[in-house]
Amino acid sequence: MDKIRKSDEVIVLTGKDKGKRGVVQRRVDANYLVVEGVNVAKKATKPNPMTGATGGIVDKLMPIHVSNVALFNAATGKADRAGFKDVDGKKVRVYKSSGEAVKV
């Protein structure tokens, strides 16, 4: 069970996008995430007449390491860590600072 999942709001802790917030769009593998509006790179694409795609420079979301982001706690307005707690026989993610459940 992952501490940071798809559709979680996260905040970037280090790097050129430090302080930016975004929503996790997908997990690339166990250690990398693609976050909306964070770590955007410019990529050159060739025109492809088969698909109708025009060539040029496009913005592409690049993966960011999971250690460089943290969950955003809306109640406190700060970055927070996640832990797990057993509630009614179910494993639930909770914020470490407050102990309340992470809302998806």
UniProtKB/Swiss-Prot annotation:
Name of the protein in its database record: Large ribosomal subunit protein uL24
GO MF annotation: an example: rRNA binding
Pfam families: KOW, ribosomal_L24
Matching InterPro entries: KOW, Rib_uL2_dom2, Ribosomal_uL24, Ribosomal_uL24_KOW, Translation_prot_SH3-like_sf
Coiled coil: none
Entry's Gene Ontology cellular component terms: ribonucleoprotein complex; ribosome
Naturally occurring in which organism (per UniProt): Herminiimonas arsenicoxydans
Keywords assigned: Ribonucleoprotein, Ribosomal protein, RNA-binding, rRNA-binding
Family label: Belongs to the universal ribosomal protein uL24 family.
Subunit-level organization: Part of the 50S ribosomal subunit.
